[in-house]
C-alpha cells in the first residue's frame, strides 16, 4: 500500500503547469506550434531528472522522453505513460485565472465576475462531484486539465514511486506537443519509447478506460467566385459564399456532433472562411467503423462531383481529404493485457472500470498506427476545450492511485 497522496502537492503541481501558455496553433507548419510548449517541456525535463529518471531528453520538437528502470528483477514488463503539453485552440488558454472550490455543495458554479456559470441542469455529472474539491476558471479561458491534469498525475505518481521505493516495472514516459492539432506525434521518437504497451492519461470521468476511437479525416472544399460591383453585378457576379452555403445543404442534418453519441459517426463543419471570390469549408469526418468511414469520405467526393456537374463552373470546386488517425482497437485487441492491467488496477483502488469508446482521438491512436497498444485512462476532468472545463482534485488523486497500481505490474 502507498501512503495517502498529498493532495496539496498534486494541486500545486497542476496549477504550476496550467500557468504555462501552451495553446497549439492549428495552421502551424512546424512543431511545437507555440513557444510555451517548449518552456513546459524544459520544466518537465528538469523535474524528471530530479526524480532520478534516466535518459531524460527534450527533442527540438518539444517531445519529452525518459526512462525509469524497474527496481524489482521479477518485474520485467515495460509500460509507457503519455500525456500532451498543448491545450486546445478552440478556446483561449492564455492567462488562465483559476478558482479552487473546496467541498462543492451542489448547484450552479459562477465563473468569475461575468455571466458564465456551470450548472448541473446542463451537466448532470456535477451531482456526482458534491463534496469534492473542484478547480474551475473565471469563465474567460479553458482550464487546461486536458491534458495538464494528466501530466500532473504522471509526475506525482513518479514522485511517489521514488520517495516510497514502491516496487515497479520498467517505465517509459513521454510528453508530446500539438496533440490537439494532430501534429506533434509525427515527430515522436519511437526508438526511444520501446515498451510492451502504453497508456495515455488523457480521459475524463473517473473510471474511464478507452481503447476504441474514431477513424478520422479532414476534408477541405474550396469554392471560387467572381466579384463585381453590386450595382452592376447581374449576370456577372459569382458569389463563392452562396455556392458554399448551397453545398453545405447536401449533408445529412442528423449526422452532426450535436445529434450523435455512442459509436455513431458524423460530419462536422468546423470552419467556414472566405469572401465572394474564394471560400474554404473545413469538415471533420468521423466514424468508428472502417467501412462506414470510407463511405463518408466517398460521400463527400461524390457530392463535389455532382455539384460541379450541376453548376458547370468555369473553375470547379476543389476537394482535399486527409486522414488524421485510425481506430486503435485493431492493435489493442492483440494486447489484451493492456486492458486487463488497467481493469485490475482500478478495482484494486476501489474504482469501477467504465469501458467506453472515445468520441475523438488521442496520441494513443497515432501510437497504435505504429504498432504500440495504448489505451486511454481517465484524468478526473470534464468539459474539455471549453470555458466550462473543470477537474476534480479527488479524481486526479484516483488517477495517481491507478497509475501506481498499474506500474506494480502484478500477476504479469
Swiss-Prot record:
- What does the cofactor section's free text say about binding? Binds 2 Zn(2+) ions per subunit.
Q: Which domain of life is it from?
A: Bacteria
Q: Does the keyword Zinc apply?
A: yes
Q: Please, one GO biological process term?
A: proteolysis
Which reactions does this protein catalyse?
Answer: Release of the N-terminal residue from a tripeptide
Known SUPFAM superfamilies for this protein?
A: Bacterial exopeptidase dimerisation domain, Zn-dependent exopeptidases
Report the coiled-coil segments: none
Taxonomic classification, please?
A: Bacteria, Pseudomonadati, Pseudomonadota, Gammaproteobacteria, Pasteurellales
Task: Please tell me where Zn(2+) 2 binds in this chain.
Answer: 146, 180, 385
Cofactor(s) needed for function: Zn(2+)
- UniProt similarity note: Belongs to the peptidase M20B family.
Name the positions where Zn(2+) 1 binds.
Answer: 84, 146, 202
Question: What is the stated purpose of this protein?
Answer: Cleaves the N-terminal amino acid of tripeptides.
Its gene name is pepT
Can you tell me which residues form the catalytic site? 86, 179 (proton acceptor)
Subcellular location(s) of the protein: Cytoplasm
Question: A cellular component term (GO) from this record?
Answer: cytosol
EC main group: hydrolase
Molecular function as annotated in GO: metallopeptidase activity; tripeptide aminopeptidase activity; zinc ion binding
InterPro entries xref list: ArgE/DapE_CS, Bact_exopeptidase_dim_dom, Peptidase_M20, Peptidase_M20_dimer, Peptidase_M20B
Question: What EC numbers are recorded for this enzyme?
Answer: 3.4.11.4
UniProt xrefs under PROSITE patterns: ARGE_DAPE_CPG2_1, ARGE_DAPE_CPG2_2
In Swiss-Prot or TrEMBL terms, this protein is called Peptidase T
Q: Which UniProt keywords apply?
A: Aminopeptidase, Cytoplasm, Hydrolase, Metal-binding, Metalloprotease, Protease, Zinc
Q: Which CDD domains match?
A: M20_peptT (cd03892)
Amino acid at each position: 500500500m502507498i501512503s495517502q497522496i498529498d493532495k496539496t502537492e498534486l494541486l500545486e503541481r497542476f496549477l504550476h503547469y496550467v500557468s504555462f501558455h501552451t495553446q497549439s496553433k492549428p495552421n502551424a507548419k512546424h512543431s511545437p506550434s507555440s513557444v510555451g510548449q517548449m518552456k513546459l517541456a524544459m520544466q518537465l525535463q528538469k523535474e524528471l531528472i530530479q526524480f532520478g529518471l534516466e535518459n531524460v531528453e527534450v527533442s527540438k520538437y518539444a517531445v519529452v522522453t525518459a526512462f525509469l528502470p524497474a527496481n524489482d528483477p521479477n518485474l520485467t514488463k515495460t509500460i509507457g505513460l503519455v500525456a500532451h503539453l498543448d491545450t486546445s485552440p478552440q478556446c483561449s488558454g492564455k492567462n488562465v485565472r483559476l478558482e479552487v472550490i473546496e467541498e462543492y455543495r451542489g448547484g450552479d458554479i459562477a465563473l468569475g465576475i461575468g455571466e458564465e456559470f456551470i450548472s448541473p441542469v446542463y451537466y448532470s455529472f456535477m451531482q456526482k462531484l458534491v463534496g469534492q474539491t473542484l478547480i474551475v476558471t473565471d469563465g474567460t479561458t479553458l482550464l487546461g486539465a486536458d491534458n495538464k491534469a494528466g501530466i500532473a498525475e504522471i509526475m506525482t505518481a513518479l514522485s511517489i514511486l521514488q520517495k516510497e521505493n514502491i516496487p515497479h516495472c520498467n517505465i517509459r514516459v513521454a510528453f508530446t506537443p500539438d496533440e490537439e492539432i494532430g501534429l506533434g506525434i509525427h515527430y515522436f521518437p519511437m526508438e526511444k519509447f520501446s515498451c510492451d504497451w502504453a497508456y495515455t492519461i488523457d480521459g475524463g470521468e473517473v473510471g474511464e478506460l478507452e481503447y476504441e476511437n474514431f477513424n478520422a479525416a479532414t476534408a477541405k472544399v474550396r469554392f471560387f467566385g467572381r466579384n463585381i460591383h453590386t450595382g452592376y453585378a447581374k449576370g456577372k457576379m459569382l458569389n463563392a459564399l452562396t455556392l458554399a452555403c448551397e453545398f453545405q445543404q447536401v449533408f445529412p442534418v442528423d449526422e452532426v456532433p450535436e445529434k450523435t453519441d455512442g459509436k455513431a459517426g458524423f460530419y462536422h463543419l468546423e470552419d467556414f472562411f472566405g469572401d465572394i471570390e474564394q471560400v474554404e469549408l473545413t469538415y471533420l469526418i468521423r466514424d468508428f467503423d472502417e467501412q462506414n468511414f470510407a463511405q463518408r469520405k466517398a460521400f463527400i467526393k461524390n457530392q463535389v462531383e455532382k455539384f460541379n456537374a450541376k453548376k458547370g463552373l468555369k473553375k470547379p470546386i476543389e476537394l482535399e481529404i486527409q486522414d488524421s488517425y485510425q481506430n486503435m482497437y485493431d492493435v489493442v485487441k492483440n494486447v489484451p493485457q493492456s486492458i486487463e492491467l488497467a481493469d485490475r488496477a482500478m478495482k484494486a483502488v476501489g474504482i469501477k472500470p467504465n469501458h467506453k469508446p472515445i468520441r475523438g482521438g488521442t496520441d494513443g491512436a497515432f501510437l497504435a498506427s505504429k504498432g504500440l497498444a495504448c489505451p486511454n485512462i481517465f484524468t478526473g476532468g470534464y468539459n474539455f476545450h471549453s470555458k466550462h472545463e473543470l477537474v476534480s482534485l479527488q479524481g486526479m488523486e484516483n488517477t495517481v492511485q491507478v497509475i501506481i497500481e498499474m506500474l506494480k505490474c502484478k500477476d504479469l
